[in-house]
Amino acid sequence: MMNSRISIIIALSCIMITSIRAYDPDALQDLCVADKSHGTKLNGFPCKETLNITESDFFFAGISKPAVINSTMGSAVTGANVEKIPGLNTLSVSLARIDYAPGGLNPPHTHPRATEVVYVLEGELEVGFITTANKLFTKTIKIGEVFVFPRGLVHFQKNNGKSPASVLSAFNSQLPGTASVAATLFAAEPALPEDVLTKTFQVGSKMVDKIKERLATKK
């Protein structure tokens, strides 16, 4: 009986350790401002020397106003993550502002390292996500309303209105990562084997080439 209990405790401990390591590491000190000039590579960033830390390491003004939208998708994402705010290192949080032109789309994508919560600053958006069972959850959200996109699931936002729209996004990761579905498949470098794409989408090579060509211009 004792051996069984010990085995269960060990198994639960392993599960807890695995769960903890699946998210950003917890901070073990007051500050660990990212030192991006350091050559060391690790899961995160090494800490800047305390004497070199300034208030600027915790400040970013880049999401205070709408971004200039010049993409063919009609949207612009301005991240406020550890790459812009070094003081976010080890804190497991970040923000982003997304601005949409009328009819603008933030195309289907995933965040492999974070759940996302969006808060509507301006306009009205159609938003949604798809589960691994191919179930679509979609809703129209307006100013002051919130919608959640679970971690790792494909999701999108679209401005169906005739005026601009904006949201503020919050993430439970200092660097959530973004993988666009279309770009991941059709604009990978090196390119995904063509027969993989033709068989997956049940289309011919000419169609694959046409999609690649169009995506290449959508920067």
From Swiss-Prot:
Its main location: secreted. Residues 59-209 form the Cupin type-1 domain. It is found in: Secreted, Extracellular space, Apoplast. Mn(2+) binds at H109, H111, E116, H155. Keywords: Apoplast, Disulfide bond, Glycoprotein, Manganese, Metal-binding, Secreted, Signal. CDD domains: cupin_OxOx (cd02241). Disulfide bonds join C32-C47. It comes from the Eukaryota. Glycans are attached at N52, N70. Gene3D superfamilies: Jelly Rolls (2.60.120.10). GO terms for molecular function: manganese ion binding. One of its GO terms (cellular component) is apoplast. The keyword Heme does not apply. It holds the Pfam family Cupin_1. GO terms for biological process: plasmodesmata-mediated intercellular transport; regulation of root development. InterPro entries: Cupin_1, Germin, Germin_Mn-BS, RmlC-like_jellyroll, RmlC_Cupin_sf. Residues 1-22 form the signal peptide. Belongs to the germin family. Oligomer (believed to be a pentamer but probably hexamer). May play a role in plant defense. Probably has no oxalate oxidase activity even if the active site is conserved. This is Germin-like protein subfamily 2 member 2. It comes from Arabidopsis thaliana (Mouse-ear cress).
